[in-house]
């Protein structure tokens, strides 16, 4: 069932895509982002265009709002967010959390093999998606730089082709 009032935590591409989708389906959506703008990895102009479009479509976009806690008060669900040093209370019926992902690199023996991780906790690879060991490849969320399904599928093709046929195709992010 479509929630009447939806809070979306996160202003990245996935949070923004789902914000607009639910709003267009008829939910009253409030998007909460702790950074100064949504779509922070994009050019500021792109961010502004998306935010303005969302507001034209009736979406409440709250930037510089840091989610602190969820409460139930008198049967009502409330998100408490901090903005400019003050608490802001946002009532909602459902919440969608889209605040990013971290690659899961623990428990696979990468540390024991000495396979280095980048600062983003992704496996370091070369342009052929090989690690420091030419027979170990990484792709998808664990290889970065983007954590999208379509990127993972694209990288998987490159890694498989390179593993089977040698250094055949370079992946360019």
Placement of each model-derived feature along the sequence:
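FAD-site-proximal beta/loop scaffold in flavoenzymes
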Residues: 1-4, 89-167
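Rossmann-like dinucleotide-binding cores of NAD(P)H-dependent redox enzymes
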Residues: 3-7, 13-87, 145-153, 161, ...
């Amino acid at each position: 069932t479509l929630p009447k009032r939806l809070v979306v935590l996160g202003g990245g591409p996935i949070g923004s895509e789902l914000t607009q989708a639910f709003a267009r389906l008829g939910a009253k959506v409030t998007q909460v982002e702790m950074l100064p703008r949504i779509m922070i990895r994009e050019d500021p102009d792109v961010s502004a265009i998306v935010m303005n479009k969302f507001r034209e479509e009736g979406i409440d976009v709250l930037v510089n709002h840091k989610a602190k806690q969820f409460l139930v008060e008198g049967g009502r669900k409330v998100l408490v967010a901090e903005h400019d040093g003050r608490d802001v209370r946002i009532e909602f019926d459902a919440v969608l959390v889209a605040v990013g992902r971290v690659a899961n690199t623990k428990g696979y023996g990468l540390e024991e093999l000495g396979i280095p991780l980048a600062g983003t906790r992704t496996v370091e690879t070369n342009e052929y998606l090989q690690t420091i060991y030419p027979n170990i490849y990484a792709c998808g969320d664990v290889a970065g730089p983007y954590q999208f399904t379509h990127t993972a599928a694209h990288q998987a093709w490159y890694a498989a082709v390179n593993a089977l046929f040698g250094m055949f195709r370079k992946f360019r992010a």
